[in-house]
């Protein structure tokens, strides 16, 4: 088999066999296939696409290029949730203890943030003493005992994906549905999930800006999962404004605690209940989505979800008293109110710009090596559709520097107030095939 033949075959719009895809991935990881040939095939895929069988084969080739986490010692159906990323996306922090409280095992591998805000790991590390570097045996033991544990990404998972992603990043082949879908799904499958719930974001703060693109990605990932024996479904949710009210690590953790107490923002609570209901059904803990939703609401109302979060924090070395004493979380030195320049209704909160403003304060990373400030960020006091009076606070800037003129300038272009009301949509579609 020759790489040049595989490139020409895909260039001319033909279907690659599983053997050809395996030959490419194996050779590329070993270093036998040079970058210039790999980038040539990536560009051919970008223009000619792949069918469902090719996408599944590419995904499994990347899974098999490295280690796979063995979660077989964990009792029950392990359901993983993946979000394509957004601004103020606190769902994992709420979902993990919430679905664990209704007996769904959550063995979660999460990453650090790059860009707008921190990842789940950064947010959890805002809790004093919390550690995510735990070995596989401890990880499995914690999930069996308490139904929930979160670890940082480690080991040699999907090395082919890491190598191919770095190549796509510099060769203009990032925005390819088969390449994005196989990249995401290879990581989820290698992490040992039996079933997968996907939260595909769309809008100004999302990777997929249009609903059409988000749908294409959701369908691609759901089909890959189902084709390789992982029960998979996707929800397309809106990221035209940040989710919830908090953007920043300790601020989002506080918001997660409030949500588990039943006092969280409406949009975050609704998205968590929608995703959580799907997870509960996939884990065979309820027969219908309505029944699953009722179980989750009961777990919040009874305090069971909050108790689960406390035990989860304690199990991983963290100070569980932060739940009742949020002032023990990192606090920013200054709180600066950003006020409305006129009266009307909020019609636009550009997620990307608000995320960048939060990053300028120190809440996110530009490179993997950057340190982040866990205390800083932005809290939205108004959301799209809300009425606001001139001089009223639109948002609060939590900063460790007094001069935030650069941040204010960024925010000026991200907020629009008009004399008409806009009603945002939170959940656009549910995709099951």
UniProtKB/Swiss-Prot annotation:
Q: According to its UniProt record, which reaction does this protein catalyse?
A: uridine + phosphate = alpha-D-ribose 1-phosphate + uracil; thymidine + phosphate = 2-deoxy-alpha-D-ribose 1-phosphate + thymine; 2'-deoxyuridine + phosphate = 2-deoxy-alpha-D-ribose 1-phosphate + uracil
Q: Which Pfam families match?
A: Glycos_trans_3N, Glycos_transf_3, PYNP_C
Look up keyword Metal-binding and say if it applies.
yes
Query: Which terms are listed as keywords in the entry?
Result: Glycosyltransferase, Metal-binding, Potassium, Transferase
Identify a single GO molecular function assigned to this protein: deoxyuridine phosphorylase activity
Q: Name one GO biological process term.
A: pyrimidine nucleobase metabolic process
Membership in a protein family = Belongs to the thymidine/pyrimidine-nucleoside phosphorylase family.
- Protein name from the UniProt record: Pyrimidine-nucleoside phosphorylase
């Amino acid at each position: 088999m020759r790489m040049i033949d595989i490139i020409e075959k895909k260039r001319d719009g033909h279907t690659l066999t599983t053997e050809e895809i395996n030959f490419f991935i194996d050779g590329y990881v070993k270093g036998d296939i040079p970058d210039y040939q790999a980038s040539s095939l990536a560009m051919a895929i970008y223009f000619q696409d792949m069918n469902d069988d090719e996408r599944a084969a590419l995904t499994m080739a990347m899974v098999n290029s490295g280690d796979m986490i063995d979660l077989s010692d964990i009792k029950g159906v392990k359901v993983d949730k993946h979000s394509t990323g957004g601004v103020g996306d606190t769902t994992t922090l709420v979902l993990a203890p919430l679905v664990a409280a209704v007996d769904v095992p959550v063995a979660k591998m999460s990453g650090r943030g790059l860009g707008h805000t921190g990842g789940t790991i950064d947010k959890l590390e805002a809790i004093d003493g919390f550690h995510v570097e735990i070995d596989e045996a401890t990880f499995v033991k914690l999930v069996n005992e308490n139904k929930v544990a979160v670890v940082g990404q480690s080991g040699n998972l999907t090395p082919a994906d890491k190598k191919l992603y770095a190549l796509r990043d510099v060769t203009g082949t990032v925005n390819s549905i088969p390449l994005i879908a196989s990249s995401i799904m290879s990581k989820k499958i290698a992490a040992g999930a039996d079933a997968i719930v996907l939260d595909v974001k769309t809008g100004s703060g999302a990777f997929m800006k249009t609903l059409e693109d988000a749908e294409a990605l959701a369908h691609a990932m759901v089909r890959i999962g189902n084709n390789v024996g992982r029960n998979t479904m996707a929800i397309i949710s809106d990221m035209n404004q940040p989710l919830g009210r908090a953007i920043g690590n300790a601020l989002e953790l506080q918001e997660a605690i409030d949500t588990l107490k039943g006092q969280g923002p409406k949009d975050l609570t609704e998205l968590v209940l929608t995703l959580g209901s799907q997870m509960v059904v996939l884990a065979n803990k309820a027969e219908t989505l309505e029944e699953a939703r009722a179980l989750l609401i009961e777990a919040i109302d009874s305090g069971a979800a909050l108790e689960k979060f406390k035990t989860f924090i304690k199990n991983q070395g963290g100070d569980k008293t932060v739940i009742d004493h949020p002032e023990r979380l990192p606090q920013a030195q200054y709180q600066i109110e950003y006020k409305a320049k006129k009266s009307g209704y909020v019609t636009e909160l550009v997620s990307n710009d608000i995320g960048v403003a939060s990053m300028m304060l120190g809440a996110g990373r530009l490179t993997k090596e950057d340190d982040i400030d866990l205390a800083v960020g932005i809290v939205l006091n108004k959301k799209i559709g809300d009425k606001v009076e001139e001089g009223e606070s639109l948002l609060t800037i939590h900063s460790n520097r007094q001069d935030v003129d650069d941040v204010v300038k960024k925010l000026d272009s991200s907020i629009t107030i008009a004399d008409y009301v806009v009603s945002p949509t939170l959940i656009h579609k549910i995709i099951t095939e």
